[in-house]
Regions:
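Actinobacteria-biased recognition of intrinsically disordered, low-complexity terminal regions
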Residues: 1-3, 416
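Extracytoplasmic/periplasmic domains immediately adjacent to an N-terminal transmembrane anchor
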Residues: 3-228
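Juxtamembrane loop-helix boundary motifs flanking transmembrane segments in multi-pass membrane proteins
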Residues: 11, 79-82, 86, 208, ...
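Loop-to-helix transition at the N-terminal end of transmembrane alpha-helices
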Residues: 53-56, 264-270, 303
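Membrane-water interface at loop-to-transmembrane-helix junctions
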Residues: 221, 225-237, 262-277, 325
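Long, hydrophobic alpha-helical segments
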Residues: 230-250
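Juxtamembrane interface at the cytosolic side of transmembrane helices
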Residues: 243-284, 288-293
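Membrane-spanning alpha-helical segments of multipass transporters and channels
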Residues: 272-277, 285-416
Length: 416
């Protein structure tokens, strides 16, 4: 009996040990779903804080100063108002991505507001939207600033109506006094006719204007036009092509026997130069594909293609250097960049949760690709912008790491 029990127990143990892979799908499901859902946290928990909005007051009136003060004192947590001395200074801040929108009070604001009772022209406030930073933020920023202008207009309307009510009350008292005097002395018809013009200080045609005296004019800075989706569209194919290129170059030299150090060095030299050729080929090819298949029309095709080529060169060197040191399993780390990077590049830093903003975003090399394309397409920069310099340094670092590994690699002789 005991021997049979031990046999059964041993058989079950062998069965379990031989079928460990049966539990692998459950483990993979736990890990993969956790990673993919964690990558969506920035998009699911968008909580904008301190989005920079410019304020420019070109008017010297008390009303304009009061508007600026009230906006700064009552700013919500999602917005941070920053004062600029001029529209030119504000636009420079927008080009430097320091502000996403702006509200400008023109120099004629107080004058036009004071003359609105006699003039049929509405008073204007100028809204500026920095569309090139992020199209989603630009849309919400335009809506928010229009709501602010609507609130300012409503408050101004109440003040104007209150002033007109005081004038009407004074006129009523004057008319009452005149009528009483006419009743006592016997008024003339001509005098009674003149009193009809004093009954209401507001012409019927101005009622709608006085109800909404202030309107907004919207000016978009660094417009995206039909190219708003280009950074996201180019990011995935360029990154995947870089991973594939690096893997192919690595596999070309694995377990390949060499007769001597000279033969190995020749191969390593070719291997370290091919990323440059591959980068230009891939960068121009994908950029051309985007014009052919997606219908993008670039102002300068060569500028976009050249920047894309530099990005691919940098990424291939970086990935290849990691692979030669840490082997193929490190590719999983770079593959995750797609899932974690895509939600992050669609948001501005002020909308990203603090953990992702502090510990993940700074280590995403793909953000230099996305921001560099934005600089070229929306901000009027050339190929050599700040992000290009970073990509070049990434390429240099990857190249050096690759050659450090090459120099310490031992020669594997050919087997007879």
């Amino acid at each position: 009996m005991l021997s049979n029990y031990n046999k059964d127990k041993g058989g079950k143990g062998q069965l379990m040990s031989k079928n460990k892979l049966l539990f692998l799908p459950f483990i993979v499901a736990i890990i993969v779903t956790l990673i993919f859902l964690a990558a969506q946290i920035p998009s699911a928990k968008v909580n904008p804080k301190h989005l920079p909005v410019a304020l420019v007051n070109e008017d010297s009136g008390e009303m304009a100063a009061l508007i600026i003060k009230n906006l700064k004192d009552n700013a919500p947590d999602a917005v941070e108002f920053i004062e600029y001395h001029s529209v030119k200074e504000m636009k420079k801040g927008m080009n430097d991505r320091k502000t996403y929108g702006g509200l400008v009070i023109p120099s004629t604001f107080s004058e036009q507001l004071a003359a609105i009772q006699t003039d049929n022209t509405p008073v204007y406030l100028d809204i500026y939207i920095n569309e090139g930073v992020n199209t989603n933020v630009a849309t919400s920023m335009e809506t928010s600033l229009n709501q602010i202008v609507s609130t300012i207009s409503s408050n101004a309307s109440k003040q104007i109506i209150a002033q007109l009510q005081q004038v009407a009350d004074q006129m009523g008292e004057t008319v009452g006094a005149q009528l009483a005097k006419m009743n006592e002395q016997g008024g003339k018809k001509e005098e009674a006719a003149d009193l009809t013009t004093m009954i209401s200080p507001v012409q019927p045609t101005k009622v709608e204007l006085l109800a909404n005296p202030i309107t907004a004019t919207v000016t978009k800075v660094n417009e995206v036009g039909k190219l708003g989706s280009v950074p996201s569209a180019l990011f995935v194919p360029l990154w995947i092509a870089s991973i594939i290129g690096a893997v192919m170059l690595y596999l070309a030299g694995t377990k390949r026997p060499f007769e001597n150090r000279i033969e190995l060095t020749k191969f390593q030299l070719i291997q370290s130069l091919i990323p440059i050729i591959f980068g230009f080929f891939t960068g121009y090819l994908i950029t051309w594909y985007s014009t052919w298949m997606l219908g993008y029309e670039f102002e300068s095709f060569n500028t976009v293609a050249l920047f894309a080529s530099i990005a691919v060169i940098a990424f291939v060197y970086m990935i290849l250097s990691f692979v030669v040191w840490l082997r193929l399993p490190v590719l999983a780390f770079f593959a995750l960049f797609i899932f974690f990077g895509l939600p992050l590049i669609q948001l501005v830093p002020e909308m990203i949760p603090s953990f992702y903003g502090n510990y993940i975003l700074p280590w995403l090399p793909i953000r230099f690709l996305v921001d560099g394309i934005k600089e070229i397409l929306f901000f009027g920069e050339g190929v050599m912008n700040d992000y290009t310099v970073v990509l070049i340094w990434i390429a240099i670092g990857g190249f050096l790491l690759l050659w450090v590994r090459n120099l310490i690699k031992k020669v594997e002789s050919k087997k007879e």
